[in-house]
Amino acid sequence: MTQNLLDQFGTPKTRVKNAISALRYGHGIIVLDNEDRENEGDLIFSGETMTTEQMALTIRYGSGIVCLCITESKRKQLKLPMMVQNNTSKFGTNFTVTIEAAEGISTGVSAKDRLTTIRAAINDNAKPSDLNRPGHIFPLQAHKNGILGRIGHTEAAIEFVTLAGFKPAGIICELTNRNGTMSKVPDIIKFSKLKKMTIVTIRDLIQYISR
């Protein structure tokens, strides 16, 4: 059903190329996962290019849980412990402890403050002391084998931003409806047209990198 609804946005290869191009130009994209998984759509941005306005849009239309997708090496660089030692979440989502920039913010919750935290974390020379814990940004460690190791939005974000030429640091947040429910495909397609955002699936991405 999902693939049929997405045919209007081109072939899977076209959708992936459009998504990569959108990210290169500093835009966000919408990524759908599989129908037999979460069956939800996430807003995805590059941590390097995301603007305060884009963060505000993400907070307004998303769940409010803004996540920073990073590699294991970045997590170790920042000395961020995992949120739990025994991960029992359904899809094995690898949350670390939450973070906040140590400098340059007020309460940490505003769009501007959250972006300041992200920039501090993804800086190539970032040190553990640059971040306070806990905070309002939720880092996620991606699988070491990327999207082929785990079919999740975390890994998709890393794959997409690196394909676009950026460092492996992606921002994700689940889209929600006004009534508080999670957005499903028909709602997500309407949103993508309203905000003129490229829409693509994780299945599209896997086909693209496996070609």
From Swiss-Prot:
Cofactor remark from the record: Binds 2 divalent metal cations per subunit. Magnesium or manganese.
Reactions that this protein is recorded to catalyse: D-ribulose 5-phosphate = (2S)-2-hydroxy-3-oxobutyl phosphate + formate + H(+)
E.C. number(s) listed in UniProt: 4.1.99.12
Magnesium in keyword set: yes
Keyword Manganese in annotation: yes
Source domain of life: Bacteria
GO aspect biological process, one term: riboflavin biosynthetic process
Binding site for Mg(2+) 2: 38, 153
SUPFAM superfamilies per record: YrdC/RibB (SSF55821)
Alphabetized GO MF terms: 3,4-dihydroxy-2-butanone-4-phosphate synthase activity; magnesium ion binding; manganese ion binding
The protein's annotated pathway: Cofactor biosynthesis; riboflavin biosynthesis; 2-hydroxy-3-oxobutyl phosphate from D-ribulose 5-phosphate: step 1/1
Record: residues binding Mg(2+) 1: 38
Required cofactor names: Mg(2+); Mn(2+)
Gene Ontology CC, one term: cytosol
Classification via InterPro entries: DHBP_synth_RibB-like_a/b_dom (IPR017945), DHBP_synthase_RibB (IPR000422)
Complex formation: Homodimer.
Function: Catalyzes the conversion of D-ribulose 5-phosphate to formate and 3,4-dihydroxy-2-butanone 4-phosphate.
Family listed: Belongs to the DHBP synthase family.
Name of the protein this chain belongs to: 3,4-dihydroxy-2-butanone 4-phosphate synthase
Native source organism of the sequence: Buchnera aphidicola subsp. Baizongia pistaciae (strain Bp)
